[in-house]
């Protein structure tokens, strides 16, 4: 990240993986907040892969640092439906979802949970039906 200057526009990272994105995330939440603050940024999103394990810790750390927390998730979207589990056909596509409000947060929790309970195929997967059902309050 570059240091802010007087001529820079406000900037917020909207695609960050924390230590809760297993095998992918290298950011420790507390250290991340320190760096975001050092760079003069006022907001940041947490979009771990398929999980929301770190959202509460992320939210509390951001608030404590005076940074606006944006809760989200990089969900895995099944090619056909979350129930289909055929190798080479039902791969995963990635989609970043961000919560606009409390309704979006609740809907994202429901969607991610359904991905684990109903759509798990090496990774928790959602599908178009879940996106249609739980889209309210999400970007």
Question: What residue ranges belong to the model's regions?
Answer:
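Phosphodiester-processing cores and adjacent nucleic acid-binding clamps
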Residues: 1-139
């Amino acid at each position: 990240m570059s240091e802010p200057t007087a001529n820079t526009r406000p900037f917020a990272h909207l695609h960050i993986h924390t230590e809760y994105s297993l095998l992918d995330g290298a950011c420790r939440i507390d250290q991340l907040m320190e760096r975001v603050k050092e760079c003069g940024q006022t907001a940041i999103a947490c979009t771990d892969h398929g999980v929301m394990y770190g959202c509460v810790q992320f939210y509390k750390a951001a608030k404590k640092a005076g940074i606006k927390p944006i809760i989200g998730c990089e969900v895995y979207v099944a090619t056909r439906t979350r129930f289909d589990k055929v190798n080479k056909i039902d791969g995963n596509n990635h989609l970043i979802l961000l919560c606009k409000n409390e309704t979006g947060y609740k809907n994202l929790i429901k969607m991610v949970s359904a991905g684990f309970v109903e759509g798990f195929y090496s990774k928790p997967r959602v599908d178009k039906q879940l996106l249609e059902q739980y889209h309210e309050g999400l970007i």
